[in-house]
Each structure stands twice: as C-alpha cells, then as structure tokens.
Swiss-Prot record:
Subunit-level organization: In the presence of PdxT, forms a dodecamer of heterodimers.
PROSITE patterns linked to this entry: PDXS_SNZ_1 (PS01235), PDXS_SNZ_2 (PS51129)
Pathway: Cofactor biosynthesis; pyridoxal 5'-phosphate biosynthesis
Binding site for D-glyceraldehyde 3-phosphate: R170
GO BP, sorted A to Z: amino acid metabolic process; pyridoxal phosphate biosynthetic process; pyridoxine biosynthetic process
Keyword field contains Nucleus: no
Pfam families documented for this protein: SOR_SNZ
A GO molecular function held by the record: amine-lyase activity
Active site positions: K86 (schiff-base intermediate with d-ribose 5-phosphate)
Protein's UniProt name: Pyridoxal 5'-phosphate synthase subunit PdxS
EC number: 4.3.3.6
InterPro entries: Aldolase_TIM (IPR013785), PdxS/SNZ (IPR001852), PdxS/SNZ_N (IPR033755), RibuloseP-bd_barrel (IPR011060)
Keyword terms of this UniProt record: Isopeptide bond, Lyase, Pyridoxal phosphate, Schiff base, Ubl conjugation
Amino acid sequence: MDPAGNPATGTARVKRGMAEMLKGGVIMDVVTPEQARIAEGAGAVAVMALERVPADIRAQGGVSRMSDPDMIEGIIAAVTIPVMAKVRIGHFVEAQILQTLGVDYIDESEVLTPADYAHHIDKWNFTVPFVCGATNLGEALRRISEGAAMIRSKGEAGTGDVSNATTHMRAIGGEIRRLTSMSEDELFVAAKELQAPYELVAEVARAGKLPVTLFTAGGIATPADAAMMMQLGAEGVFVGSGIFKSGAPEHRAAAIVKATTFFDDPDVLAKVSRGLGEAMVGINVDEIAVGHRLAQRGW
C-alpha cells in the first residue's frame, strides 16, 4: 500500500514479487495461440509471444522488431497464464506499446535487433516488470539498477546448444560467491570492476544471491538441459526454439516442465526423457562467428 492507502503498483517490490511468482517454472516461446494453449496445457508458468522463434530469427536474418500487436493480443486472449513479449534493447517506445497492450512482463531482449547500442531502457518508468539477459554478474547488476525485475542468463538463443547457458550461469554464480567472502573495502573495488552500484554489490554480498529472480535461457532443448541449469542455480527456465522446433512438442514441453520441477531426481529425469522424438538439430555455438552471436548484444 502507498501512504494514501492505495494498492502499490509498479514499485520495485511489486514487480519483483510478480517475477518471484514464476520461480520453479518454465516459460515457453510461442508464435500462435494454438502453441500458447499447448504450452499452458503442458504446465508452462508463462508464455513469450513472438512472431519468430530465435532459431528462425537466426536463420532468416534481417532486422527483428517487436511483434505485431494483433498477434500479441491473440495470444493474450488464448491463455490464462501470464504473457510476456520482447522489445529491442533501448527501444522504450516499443515498451510503451507493450505496456498499453496489457502484457504481463516485457523482455528487453538481445534476440531482437538492438535499437540503441549505448543505452538500455529506463525500466523504472514502467509499471510492467522487465526481464533482461546477462552473461555475468556485472551485466546483471547494471540491468537491475535500471529497474529489471528478473534476470535470465543469456546463453545463445536459437542454437539448441546449452554450452553458453552453462557458461553464463556458472559465471554469475561464481562471481556472487566471490563477493560473499570480501571485506567492505574490497566490495568498493569489486563494484568498480563490475561497473555496478556499490549498494547493489553489497546487497548481493550479504544475501549470497541476486535481489531479483534468476532464470536461465539459450539453447535449452531437452529435459536434461533444463534440469542441469536448475542444478547450477537457475530458479526457472526459458525455452525458445527447443520445443516447437523438435519432434512431439506437446510431450517435450510437458517433459521439460516436469524436469524443471524434479531437477534433482534422476529417476524422474530418466522417465521423462523417454520417447520425445528428435530434438532440434540446432547449431554449435563455436560455428557462429563472434559478430553474429546474440549474447554479446547489450553491455
């Protein structure tokens, strides 16, 4: 409640609380209302509405922008779970449009073509919670200082190769653990190295975790991938091309949801990994020229 007794909306506490509600779940990319219904039926906690999944964006090239409002509204109408949508890095007007459309979360995404190579969106100006990607702790803290309510380790979207997701999750976790052993004067140096506000760095050092929910993304294509990322410290999973670019998407979606819930139970993981058909063929991250890697977008 605010001082006048009205419900608090758009505050950091409210927005972070909305992101916390998704913990332990799977968020799936969908391009049609039918896919959204499949995702909801499989147990997804939210869907990401976009016109092309990352694998298609990578294959087709060109400039990728915010999805058509009619398409987004069609998906909002098709499901009862929260709906996210992506905007280009720095494109605050796309974010204004999505907020007006009534999406539940906005993803300032490196998967789309950046609109601004120097500035990210000032997310404090919005009542809708934002999700942002990060490859390391400094990047995560900078996004949080701009108002992000959820961080996802980036991985390399649209590849089906989970190696970058593990690299980024381990980097964030390792840097957090390093902070927890530092003295106060060392934290000032760390804040300078991380290019992040000292207050946030000190908060992470005290808590041993980020002050917002940490999901993982990029290259997750199997139940085992999802479970591994959860064991590495993720609090939930984004799955993009890995479901609807694979065989038997309904079964694969449900299996990934179950693997995310029972990530530390090998018996369950073995059971849900059976009979899923062929996983997406994908592409090895090492085969992608550095200049074409999506994870490097942002700063």
